[in-house]
């Protein structure tokens, strides 16, 4: 890729080596943000470590995180994620990629041009209606049973939602679920060789299967059309003057589906845990949702909710889904008083900023009111709250993700109240999206 892979980082505080890499990777997976805060306290705002087989520099200072997230002339998103996923998809080795996650500059702008119409207001409203119906049916099943192992159930449900709104299919969820999960979990493998790592081998297999499933559908979608994202993209890329070919189309959809199912299911698991622990906030959200004028929730309704959105934001602060922004240095860059060599793999620790006591009042406490206009703690620094990124790499599906969460809240909270079967003290984990620990097993009672 034209970038150095070995750099002298000995001038930085921290630790490296196989033992440190295993310890740090397991710390991320098991203890998430708590592990990162402990590392920050031990080594300072900039330190070197190992993660999932790579040498990494971590930055926890808000100004540094903002600089890393916004400065596209010094930091490359493309090279970071290409490095992280290299070996899962054979085409990564030839840098023939079209997912916005793997691109910078003009290719990134071209990919977003293809995606943005498929995430416009009208399209997102259609996706919202389809998702709401599935959420309502699931909530009814859980109420009828009186209990649900929520983390497992929501993961399966979100694959079902993704295949409905992104592919327009109702029966494809089971075959996509296994492939998506296998693919998504691969980058956390400590050994990145399919001969010695079952997780890495499964990830390669999952990606290959996703490509097969999607490629087999392209011709029929171009012929028949549809309101789902895949059909819209098939129609657009068939006449897009070569911005994205069919391989690129497949990669775009894999990127969207992977991000959508994993991140939204993780966020909802964390939010439901918090609401089970804080029934007063569960009731406040319920009252706001029941007060809507519409006989059935609409996409416009989802954008008008205040209490529900504050709870969702506080969930993403306490249990960040994306704990860091990954970059590689395009040239030698200064982070504080340290010189970072070109090619260095760098993580801007968004999750550490989300617990910074200089920005957040009692940051360990669940307090959605910190997002009110009066307190506006999320406005104290431009890097204080970046759950969907910033600048050109802001998540294209941000509005859909927020709307999906509001739709789920309406489906669940207007039908039932819920509590934990066995209360437990949860922690933030990373597997590979940030998520609350434990199974989140619920007792569910009809209103």
Where are each of the predicted segments found?
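Cytochrome P450 catalytic-domain helical core, especially the substrate-recognition surface
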Residues: 2-37, 55, 82-220, 247, ...
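Cytochrome P450 heme-thiolate "Cys pocket" and heme-binding signature region
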Residues: 97, 101, 296-300, 338, ...
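Cytochrome P450 catalytic domain signature, combining two hallmark sequence patches
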Residues: 66-87
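Cytochrome P450 I-helix active-site segment
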Residues: 13-18, 227, 274-322, 336, ...
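Cytochrome P450 proximal C-terminal region
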Residues: 9-12, 40, 135, 179, ...
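Conserved cytochrome P450 catalytic core segment spanning the I/J/K helices
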Residues: 20, 120, 207-267, 282, ...
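Cytochrome P450 catalytic-core helices
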Residues: 261-288, 398-415
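Conserved cytochrome P450 K-helix/beta-meander segment immediately N-terminal to the heme-binding cysteine loop
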Residues: 74, 348-376
